[in-house]
Amino acid sequence: MEPINDSYTVVSRKPSLTPSGWFGNSKDMIVELENFMTPEEVEFLEKAAKSLTIWDVTQSHVNENGTVVYDSDYWKDRVASNPSLDKNDPAISPVIAGLFQRLKPIVEEFYKVEVVPTGTTIVKWMPGQFQKPHADNELHEGPDAGTPNDFPHYNISRLFYLNDDYEGGELYFPLQGVQFKPKKGAAYFFPGDRNFIHGVTEIKSGLRFTCPFFWEITKHTGERQP
């Protein structure tokens, strides 16, 4: 990595071993597991999320072409990954990690892969915030379309939803024509490439809390190989 000023760092990322578009573009690749979390897990994590006071401090990144691949200002004071979670309450991360392990065999069987998860994270969404359609592991438009973003190993995206006492904040997939308000306690997963760009509609009121994390594919186990 090469610093270019006080605000941005140039980064170069290696592509994933899984080609973009490997999983096609069917809406059937977007999976909902309703009531995946137990009532006790939901209650604990919702309360923990609403009590967070320590958030990550990060730096924005650009690629070799000067395109922003991670904007730290957008996420300021609303993302708590593992180190920040531990400073808030060391009991939080083990509960989320337990969800990872329970979901792992389901994801591996569905996509015919072996995966490892990224770290534990809770994200807060406040009124007025939204997210434009994006892919999780690559850039999807302009001259950099198809090149890695800051997270090329985010092959499969996964979200746990911790609350539903807010308005707006729907998850949508414009290429598949899918839009819905995620259900409290549910798990969702889908491919991270540009065939599954997705966004979040504006939060109108209340606070929206999610546990996003991602799976890196380390091996393809099906007959079809990249």
Q: Residue spans of the language-model regions?
A:
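Non-heme Fe(II)/2-oxoglutarate
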Residues: E2-F110, T121
